[in-house]
Amino acid sequence: MRRIFTFFLTFLLGMFVTALYAQTHTVSGTVIDKDANEPLIGANVLIKGTTIGTVTDLDGKYTLQAGDKDILVFSYLSMKTIEEPVNGRTVINVKMTSDTETLGEVVVTAMGIKRQSETLTYSAQTVGGKDVNDIKSVNMINSLQGKSAGMMITPNSTGAGGSSKILFRGNKSISGNNQPLVVVDGVPVMMNITNSQVDSNYGGQRDGGDAMSTINPDDIAQITLLKGASAAALYGAVAANGAIMITTKSAQSGKVSVNVSSNTTMESPMVLPEFQTTYGMSDNGTFSWGEKLSSKAPNYAKKFFRTGFTTNNSISLSGGNENIQSYFSYANVYSQGITPQNDYRSHNLNSKVGFNILKDIHIDFTAKFTNQHITNQAAAGYLWNPLTGVYLFPRGEDWNGYKENFEVYDPARGCYVQNWTNTQQQQFGNPYWMLNRQIPITDRNRYEFGGSIKWDITPDLNIQGRMRYERGEEHWVHNAYASSVGNLYPMGRMKDNRYFSDQLYGDVLVSYNHTFNDFSLSATAGSSFTKTKTSHVDLWGEGSQFSQPGSGNIFYPNIFTPNNYYGNMSTVGKDDNWMTQKRLNSVFATAQLGYREGIFLDISARNDWSSALAFTESCSFFYPSFGGSVLLNKFVDMGKNIDLFKFRASYSIVGNDVPVFMSNLLYSLGSQGAITPPDKAPFRTLKPEKTHSLEIGFDGTFLQNRLNINLTYYKTNTKNQFFSVAAPYESGLRNRYVNAGNVENKGFEFSIGWYEQFTDHFSWSTNLNFSYNDNKIKELVDDLPNGLTLTDFGRSEERR
């Protein structure tokens, strides 16, 4: 009897659920900003009178189950609330307009967590995709110049395809990395393939590019700049210098949409060095301090450069329904640098597919491929840089003669050699010889594959898992003809480098958001891992002396094959091959408590385990972050002309990870198979750098959100800097590492903006940014009476 009753009760319950389900159907659509004609991220969509609802995704899309008689309520901070009856519709698209009585925007913060801007306890600035696309560049990040206080972007002088140096609030590390972390859709990306920084002064270190140049600007929906350590603390050691959060576009449900864009920009040198034009060439044919010229020498530098241009072409397709959405884009870039024969080409393919599984589970897959081809990219130093010869060309000499006849035949060598005022010196040479006989060629491929799954367990609780794999490949060939670099390579040089980089990243996040009467709680906890691998294969050979066949050097000049380099491995090198692997495991948590939407308290914590510290006393390091903000306008009647009057403060301690192979002995294999012992002592007590950051600020908007003002004061101290110093003679080693030093940055940032909406189709906005940073080295290594000398090939810097 009990079984029959149970079966009957289950049957009735099933019929009830089925009947209830039959009364609802899937409703989807897109919510956009009517004024900007852009999707709204994080807009709330609720069934009126219930707690059932959802939020729009990165492209303004939403999907939920609703009945025919239900009313959907669309709300978004700073927008007027809209109510739409379902009435049997399956697609409801909404255009929202500004509400001058409210304020705020949704900001994508660390780990991809979305928050209302007015709740943040630190400085964060958002830039729309349109701002990046107004004036496109080969490197997308260059389009952000001047758009944020406290951010300095310096494109390298290596020409088209080169990287850019990005600084938030000054240099913090003397020996380590100062670049901010780049994050795409919540996941950190590899900054460059070669893992090199362009800082060589003499040896001509090349530019390995960066991840920003592989991003199609038309794929960008939003960029958030997290300039302080507190803002990026959840990313841990890799984000001690801040983070650039890039949110890309996804597919929208509905009919297929196609977007096509093409633009061309031109550039030319704005400022050139001033040259003396009174004295001619010196006796050695190198400098310009010889006899006084009878007439003023012309400015040859102006004749060297050309007008550069960059053309960007892009097409994207998106579409789908409530169950599956897809987005595809293709872009190509062709650029001619201002240096002759410096050309850049790239192709970018990007695809994203999203699936709504059941009611509460969403899955995304992404795939991306980028190919870059660069010719005649100048080196960072002056050894292989044609600009050195342009700027130091002896005054009064025949520029056109060296341009048209950059090489002459040398019967002794049986080949053409460089024609220059002094072919024996190494500092600089004929720039046209370099452009035609020392051509560096770079080919890069970058592959990215990723996926994520999110389960909305309840309207307040969700769990999300993400994973991304990246692979970078680079092939760099630089063959120099005989007589290059003066007497350094009289018979030429062959160089063939291949770099490979792999990064695997994964994380799991659990998020909870709930409002309890006057209180609100937003919390996220999770774990992540990052595994990187970099390898390098270098084949090179040099003709460093005039040789006869069989002498152990080059056989025929200007034939760049390994077989042309004779005998021993000192002339054909394979010993510059290496591989590094690194792993970083982390756990983290963050929580924000709000009171009456006017007081907010933040706390974050993270612990990292780095394989670079595996041989030290502890490979683990912990750091916290705290913050608070008060919106006085929520508690004090300030009149209709004050929309937001907010004060904020935050404090954090964030680590900066160290390079590999510092805590253990590193043996290398020589070209003859011999094992080479290390020349540096293992650093068993190595500690990561720690950045202590304090930030205090004010945010205000006035006159119905027309006027906005932001002011921030900050102070950072980065301690535990790591240095290489001379080891005691009796140790048998050359150097040892030490933790020491304190680098301080303090300053303020100020920005003011005005926005005016004249009509539905015409608006005007302007912004002014100003920042000041005082960068000082407060402490260095103790017990070094002669100071600390940091050396690079051909350069030394003494710091006291």
Across the structure, where does each feature detected by a protein language model lie?
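Structured core elements
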Residues: V107, T126, M152, L167, ...
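Extracellular/periplasmic, surface-exposed regions of secreted and cell-surface proteins
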Residues: Q179, G290, G308-T311, S346-H347, ...
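Short small-residue beta-strand/loop micro-motif enriched in glycine and branched aliphatics
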Residues: M191, Y327, S335-I338, L488, ...
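Low-complexity intrinsically disordered tracts that form flexible linkers/tails across taxa
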Residues: I193, I374-F393, L780-L784
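Acidic, glycine-rich flexible loop segments
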Residues: T310-T311, Y382-W433, R437
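Short, small/polar-rich motifs associated with maturation and membrane association
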Residues: R2-L9, M15-N350, F355-L358, H362-D364, ...
